[in-house]
């Protein structure tokens, strides 16, 4: 606020004795050096249309665009002092064609904020005001599976551990009649040696991976999105479902074991090529994959949705039986 800025200016003049409040650059430099303002906050204030730096009980302190993508920022709860991740949009952001065609849903975000689980990211609030829309979640420590796989495939044992956690997360969503709709190596994070967690999009309703207006708060390369698209999405009007989530889990599992996208010629496929691949081509698995694991994956990626696991609970039981499969 202006009152706060004036207070900071008086504090600086009192402590240095030679800073004029008219010297904007010097004042800005000193505010940054004394921790009163971050470089990100200063740059935001200097934009032609400044983005809000205070949203309800939260203060926006830095960008997370390099880590998480466009519109992601780091926030601090001014009452608790905790650091959070925030996805935020201004009115201008929401005028983009993709958002106008498929707008965020505040009701969906409120639903997600009521659902918690040890293997799920935790969304705590959504703020919708005339000039902005923002969602806040606890920050995750670790790295996405996509980054982990750039160093090589997971061991069978580690992949089973990943699946136990992610299936637990998906079961928690499905039990509340929520579909994830964006399961890829970008949405699964390894947070410690023994724990994987699932990131979710709490505010943009799921839609077909082939949709021209597809959008998600989880920044996802198109190739990963298409690689996990269930065969039924080739039919017009097909919406994400529990079965398409299970299919995507199977593709991600195979991806983790191979260390690459588990479909032939994946780097050369266009949209029609991807649709034919999911309808006709068997998924690739490493030759060393134990048969019980391979059997689980094949059930998950069955071309016919009715041939897959019935639900996440049935899949969880199958994974629990894999002890010693490595």
Task: Describe these PLM feature segments.
Residues 1-112, 123, 129, 135-137, ...:
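Non-catalytic accessory regions
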Residues 116-124:
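Conserved HxN/HPN-centered segment at the entrance to the catalytic loop
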Residues 145-154:
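AlphaC helix of the protein kinase catalytic domain
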Residues 162-163:
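Activation segment signature within eukaryotic-like protein kinase domains
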Residues 168-178:
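Protein kinase catalytic-loop region centered on the HRD/HxD motif
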Residues 187-203:
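Conserved protein kinase catalytic/activation segment
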Residues 216-232:
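Conserved activation segment of eukaryotic-like protein kinases, specifically the C-terminal portion
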Residues 227-325:
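C-terminal lobe helix-coil module of Hanks-type protein kinase domains
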């Amino acid at each position: 606020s202006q009152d706060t800025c004036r207070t900071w200016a008086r504090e600086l003049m009192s402590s240095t004795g030679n800073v004029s409040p008219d010297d904007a650059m010097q004042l800005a430099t000193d505010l940054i050096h004394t921790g009163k303002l971050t470089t990100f906050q200063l740059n935001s204030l200097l934009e032609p249309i400044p983005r809000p730096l205070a949203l309800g009980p939260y203060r926006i302190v830095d960008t997370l665009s390099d880590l998480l993508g466009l519109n992601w920022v780091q926030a601090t709860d001014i009452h608790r002092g905790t650091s959070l991740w925030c996805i935020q949009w201004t009115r201008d952001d929401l005028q983009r064609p993709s958002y106008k065609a498929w707008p965020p849903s505040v009701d969906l975000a409120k639903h997600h904020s009521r659902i918690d689980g040890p293997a799920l990211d935790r969304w705590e609030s959504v703020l919708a005001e005339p000039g902005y829309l923002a969602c806040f979640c606890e920050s995750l420590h670790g790295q996405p599976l996509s980054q982990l796989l750039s160093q090589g495939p997971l061991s069978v044992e580690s992949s089973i551990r990943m699946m136990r956690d992610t299936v637990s997360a998906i079961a928690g969503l499905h039990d509340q009649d929520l579909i994830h709709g964006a399961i890829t190596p970008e949405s699964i994070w390894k947070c410690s040696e023994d724990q994987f967690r699932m990131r979710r999009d709490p505010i943009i309703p799921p839609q077909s991976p082939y949709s021209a207006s597809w959008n998600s708060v989880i920044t996802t390369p198109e190739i990963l999105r298409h690689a996990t698209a269930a065969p039924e999405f080739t039919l017009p009007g097909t919406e994400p479902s529990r079965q398409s989530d299970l299919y995507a889990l199977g593709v991600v599992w195979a991806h983790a074991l191979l260390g690459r996208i588990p479909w032939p010629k994946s780097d050369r496929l266009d949209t029609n090529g991807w649709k034919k691949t999911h309808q006709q081509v068997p998924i690739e698995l490493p030759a060393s994959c134990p048969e019980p694991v391979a059997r689980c994956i094949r059930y998950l990626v069955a071309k016919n949705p009715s041939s897959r696991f019935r639900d996440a609970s049935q899949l969880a039981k199958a994974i629990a039986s894999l002890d010693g499969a490595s």
